[in-house]
Amino acid sequence: MSDMFPHNPLRFDARGLSASDQVKLYRQLLLPRLIEEKMMSQLRQGKISKWFSGMGQEAISVGVAAAMPEDQFIFPMHRNLGIFTTRNVPLDRLFAQFQGKDYGFTKGRDRSFHFGSREHRIVGIISPLGPQLGLADGVALAEKLDGTGGCSFVFTGDGGASEGDFHEAVNVAAVWQLPVIIGIENNAWGLSTPSEQQFRCAHFTDK
């Protein structure tokens, strides 16, 4: 399994970031981690029924949400809590959603997925993940036709990249030259399916 990931050291380049910027980013990284720890604790206590953890992946969500203009749409996955916290979605509504309460975005029926916030330009998560890419293409097409200069950002995983929707959306985006960014988070699992059962190459990037 370790061979799936190239062993390149991470390097952080802080040039262009003030001390206050770095503190702000750190706090934005810390918040979803603290929420994750709380929800994992509640899961073990039986206070919630399900939780898709994104621990260790916070920097991806926070970095994207911090870099994207707030008026442009993001299509997150079920492990992208940092998108919601960085875009300042009210925490009381988030916790209500996670805990199955009426005040949640879908009255809590969908727990940590299938909900979004138009106000915060976050599109509700689609379970199979692949179909999200086509929707992001559509938003990008609207941005292009309207001449806004904006773009959309859509997340998928290594498992989602095995779906036919992924290849169709990538092809359409390329042919129509759409302003869409596709971010693939590779955690080596498509839910319970390991990478070696998804593709036959040494590294995911070869795919």
Please name every model-derived segment.
Residues M1-I60, A67-M68:
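Conserved acidic/glycine
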Residues E37, S41, G46-W176, T193-D206:
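Cofactor-binding active-site loop characterized by glycine-rich and histidine/acidic residues
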Residues R79, E185-A188:
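Short, ordered loop/turn segments at secondary-structure junctions
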Residues G157, I184-E185:
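Active-site flanking residues adjacent to catalytic metal/cofactor-binding acidic residues
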Residues L10-R11, V23-K24, F153-F155, W189-L191:
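A short, structure-level motif marking secondary-structure boundaries and short turns
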Residues P179-I182:
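Short, proline-centered helix/strand-breaking motifs
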